[in-house]
Amino acid sequence: MVKKKSIFTQELIVGIVLIALYLVFRTISADFGKYTTFLSMMDISYYYALMAIGVAFPLITGGVDLSIGTGMICYALAGGCLIRFYNVPTGVAMLVSILFGVGIGLANGVLISVMGLPPFLATLCTCMITRGLGSVVTGSFAIPWPTAKQPNGWFHSIFKITLADKTKLPLGLLWIILLTLLMQFVLAHTRFGRYTIAIGSNKEAAILSGINVKFYHVMVYMVSGLFAGLAAIAYAAVIKTVQPGTGAGMELDAIGGAIVGGVSASGGYGTIYGTVIGAYVILVLKQGLPYIGFNANMQQIITGFVLIGAVTIDIVKRKVIK
């Protein structure tokens, strides 16, 4: 069972940190406070938030999915190739990207549940496979998706809407909010969600209580793959041209966001609300640091310390509860 008081406290703290972080960067740098910077950050946030929502489920079971970053790129490349070389309708290509993600998630689940591979090793293997596969299929050439002005570029409007006065609004943020509410409901109020938490809390007890642990393990990785596929579409809409061989490291930002948002690194605890807020904390941190003079290396160092702090807080909190 999830303790509501603890959950809301965690989310509130992370939400305050997010607001404070944004205000600090905006105060120090006038450029960071520009509306165009905000829109750019919102664009990037779509695929990061989607990956974080998906990976939260394996994390809550005590597992991990390292394939979501390179997988997202691979699925976007697959859909882009279908449109570019085979004139496949955009909607069909998007569906293929999503199903590709679900398929890799299924493979991860089978490797872990049926074959008994550790989640870290199994998903590391599929991470390498998807990264290489994207390069092989495309010949290492970048694959452009249709632009918003092209007839088959309608999918861009899912993530951004332009008003009559040319003001652009981050419509994708609305989809993130709706998906967050939906998946939080799934986690907290469905059998799938309750069993996911139960497996992460005590796998042996879950087995003894009659839960088909292998089945639900496969399911959580399919959910992770599903959201990586959705993230692939968001990535294609925002970035427009997908470059093979990229994506490595994005999974760490998504996982880091989930942990910062309160998902326990050892499983059994977490919310989708907190996960998404945590993903935005990592995003604001990574986007804001360059504006105050920190280079890419320093960004990695600071982000690493933030994650260490989040994991330490989780460990201390679990000891206090015990």
Where are these regions (language model features)?
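Cytosolic-side transmembrane-helix boundaries in multi-pass membrane proteins
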Residues: 1-23, 27, 201, 207-215, ...
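Transmembrane helix-bundle core of multi-pass membrane transporters
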Residues: 5-6, 120-190, 216-219, 239-247, ...
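Hydrophobic alpha-helical transmembrane segments
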Residues: 11-16, 41, 49, 70-74, ...
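Structural signal for alpha-helical transmembrane segments and their membrane-water exit/capping regions
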Residues: 17-33, 137, 184-191
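Single transmembrane alpha-helix segments in multi-pass membrane proteins
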Residues: 23-86, 110-116, 262-272, 305, ...
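Alpha-helical transmembrane segments within multi-pass membrane transporters and channels
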Residues: 87-127, 277-278
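Helix-loop-helix "hairpin" substructures at the membrane interface of multi-pass membrane proteins
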Residues: 89, 93-94, 103-108, 112, ...
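Transmembrane alpha-helical segments in multi-pass inner-membrane proteins
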Residues: 221, 227-228, 238-304
